[in-house]
Amino acid sequence: MAEIKNAKVEQRQTKIRNVPVAVTPEGFWCCPSPVAFQKTLKSHNSLTKHKQSSPALQPPKPEKKPSSTTIRSVIASDETQQNLGSFDTVHSIAVPATVQERPQRQKVETLPRKVAIEFGEPGSSDAKVILVGKQGFCVKLSVHKKVLVDHSCFFAKKLAEKDSVFACLEIESCEDAELYVETIGLMYCKDMKQRLMKQNVSRVLRVLKVAELLGFSSCIQSCLDYLEAVPWVGEEEEEKVISSILRLKTEGVGVTPVLKRVASNAVDPPKETLSRIIELVLRSKEEKSRREMKSIVLKLLREQNGANVADNFNDTIYSSCQTCLDSVLSLFKQASEGEKPETDTKQIAVEADNLTWLLDVLAERQAAEEFSVTWANQKELALLHEKLPLMSRYHISRVTSRLFIGIGRGELLPSKDTRLLLLTTWLQPLFNDYNWLQHGCRSFDGKLVEEGIGRTILTLPLEDQQSILLSWLGSFLNGGDGCPNLQRAFEVWWRRSFIRPYSDRQANGSCQTDSTSKEE
């Protein structure tokens, strides 16, 4: 806090420049022109800059270490204190001593700008508080000792040290003189809540800071009540509020109601809540709302990735995947028997979209390898796929496409056997549905899928690459644009096989190395 000094008024014949000030019936000061006080401050700052030819070097401020206080620990400690009962004693705020030597302050007599403000009935004050800004700007407050002592444990302590009838306190290096004036003025207010309602969140936080420094507990509580009720607009404002609350050191004030807006007493986000959200999204009957919420939840989970998430959340996702797979298999069986074809087609499209979304979630969390194993082993589903009309089945190939894209991007790294089984089981069904995917799915990106398929094939041994690409070549030559274009992968395989056959050279080189090592 700013440094405090006891001053004697009789020793300083200060020339105070009065500004237009109106005193309310409650004793609170206000300027007829709302910007009068700010203009005085600004004009003084500009004059000071012109007059100073070589500004004094300011001492370096010590770096503030970030507080390790957590929201939950503050809530827990605050609730414990409330359970113990109300506090009878008021703790005063200690004024930290100035560690580093400062340049000598300009004398009050030579200051170019001064403002005088009187609280309460004119001529009834019995104390003075002089606020001296860092650049010499001075505000002289005519106040009442009883009001200061009743509301501020800081002023009560300082005034108790003085013996004179008329006390004068000087606060030096005051960073925010305007807020000091407003906070002291709140001591004369009968209804602080009504006064604070006219302010914004940023200004109330500044008042809260000054109120804590002055030990003005009723003002601190009023500020907390205001912050608990008022909306916080934007993440930046929310961060300011929370950081200010966590820095509070005054005991006996309840910060829990404010902090409960952003934190609960639960140690971890409950698994049941996450499961419920996933279930609600997957079971939504309204397509537009379901699509929007899938996008929002995926974005939030992406932001939460690496943060404190329930360890068993992946189990929840895989449980939902299995439920969707069972539903798809049942729908395929019904559709193959000709039962309710239109209803089955719509529901298959919904379940396929759900599986694709769950795969997106797992890929973001780098936990999709198990899904690739499960999908590669869906042989019964792949056999039923051939029996269904294109209109009913092609949505399922979106899941296969998403897996190939993920492998091509390196989002999941299944084993060689899993990659080969995936291509063996689902590549031909994807070829058969490819033309419908291109024209029937707005979100389908053919170039991305083709790149993913090609990269997946090229991760296999050369013999498997040859087998799969020759099979693709026959389909492509017969189907044309209705088949994925894997020409890039075909060129890479060709060069590996015929232009740069590394295998023979490496085999010969390794044999020579082995024989040389044996001779030695």
Curated annotation (Swiss-Prot):
Pathway assigned to this chain's UniProt record: Protein modification; protein ubiquitination
Region (Disordered): 43-68
Coiled-coil spans in chain: none
Residue ranges of every copy of the BTB domain listed in the record: 127-196
Keyword Glycoprotein listed: no
InterPro entries: BTB/POZ_dom_prot
Keyword GTP-binding included in the entry's annotation: no
Keywords attached to this entry: Ubl conjugation pathway
Any GO BP annotation: protein ubiquitination
Job description of the protein: May act as a substrate-specific adapter of an E3 ubiquitin-protein ligase complex (CUL3-RBX1-BTB) which mediates the ubiquitination and subsequent proteasomal degradation of target proteins.
Protein name according to UniProt: BTB/POZ domain-containing protein At3g50780
Record organism: Arabidopsis thaliana (Mouse-ear cress)
Lineage: Eukaryota, Viridiplantae, Streptophyta, Embryophyta, Tracheophyta
